[in-house]
Amino acid sequence: MKPRVLLTVLLYLIALHSFCVGLALIIIPIPSLDFFGFSGYSGSFFKAQGGIFHIVMSIIYIIAARDVDKYPILIYLTLTAKFIATIFLLGYYFIFDHVWMVLASGIGDFLMGLFVYLLWKWHTKKKD
């Protein structure tokens, strides 16, 4: 399979993941957050803000996926977002609070970013 096709599919899957995470953050009841390791959480603003952020990012991933060659800046934005998220989440987990969902999210963002990077490099190398 061509790297462009794989990259496009991956970006659509990342968009779906981000949209679902965003929607879940917005609608999940606060008491349910205990399951994910966030005990004692009482406010809804930051939960909703994080949800909206994920939905906005899913739109960026969809636009990037529609034509990876037309908007390469969105590939770089995707990589930047995923690797900043990785550093933040893993740093938070290891320095501040051992919340299992934070660790899982950090690993997930790293893997998504890594695969986007590898497919983008493969795709741009094939174009030369």
How should these model regions be labeled?
Residues 2-4, 66-71:
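Membrane-interface helix-boundary motifs at transmembrane edges
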Residues 4-44:
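Membrane-helix boundary elements
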Residues 8-11, 15-18, 51-54, 75, ...:
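Residues within membrane-spanning alpha-helices of integral membrane proteins
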Residues 19-24, 42-65, 77-83:
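Core segments of alpha-helical transmembrane spans in multipass integral membrane proteins
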Residues 26, 62, 90, 114-117:
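Membrane-embedded alpha-helical segments of multi-pass transporters/permeases
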Residues 34-45, 73, 77, 98-108:
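Non-cytosolic membrane-interface motifs at loop->transmembrane helix junctions
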Residues 66-69, 87-104, 121-122:
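Membrane-helix boundary connector in multi-pass membrane proteins
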Residues 111-128:
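Membrane-water interface at the C-terminal end of transmembrane alpha helices
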